[in-house]
Amino acid sequence: MPSSDGPILDAVGLERSFGALRVLRGVDVRVHAGEALVVAGPNGAGKTTLLRVLAGLARPSAGEVRILGVPVGPSAPDARRAIGFVSHLSMLYDDLTVHENVVLAARLYGARDPGAAARRALEAVGLADRGDDQPRRLSRGLLQRASIARALVHEPRLLLMDEPFTGLDAPAAGRLRALLRQRLSAGLALVLVTHHLAEAWELASRVAVLAGGRWALEEPRPGDLALFLPRYHALADA
């Protein structure tokens, strides 16, 4: 359930420009503990840029991101440590094993026992027996699961995910949804970007459509995906 103590993520007036190109145009994002905001939209809408700004990996041209009430930035390492980020591109080092990659993330985020934390994270995503593999030897789906373990190893308060179901077969996708439901029930705040709403529909507390760098829609999840999809396509194609 949402916390009465305020949101985990509170971002206001986010703008991001590349020269004359405005990619984000005054976007507000607020997510409480136990909530999942699922974001969809057409290619080029600004979804990945939004996640990078929320994660502190890109600076907004205007606006502010606060995690647990603290502005995200170089001078706020505690706010950054509260974030887990799953990119649509691999963030793993090919010269390290999967286990070593996850241990490295645990150390960077200050885990008390990085090795044990890495083993728990790999087990949670079904990779307990693949820790000695190098990322280059993994399939796209296994690589995605390793990236999710890396993002979860430090028990973040906020998880940002960009197309996390890409490359996952049906059993692995089901396992990921079950894991995310478990973490949400324990108070995780989640922002999940997807091109395929059906993959994440059951997880969503709220759904949003980003189009042209703005929210075209942001509301509690409707009950019926089939009834929602015509609205989504009308907004995304406008």
Model-assigned labels for residue ranges:
Residues 103, 107, 113-130:
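Conserved ABC ATPase "signature" region
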Residues 55:
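Helix-to-loop junction immediately C-terminal to a conserved catalytic motif
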Residues 155:
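Conserved catalytic motifs of ABC-family nucleotide-binding domains
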Residues 194-195:
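H-loop/switch region of ABC-family ATPase nucleotide-binding domains
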Residues 63-71, 79:
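Conserved ABC transporter NBD signature motif
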Residues 40-42:
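The feature captures the beta-strand-to-loop junction immediately N-terminal to the Walker
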Residues 159-162:
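Catalytic Walker B motif of ABC-type/P-loop ATPase nucleotide-binding domains
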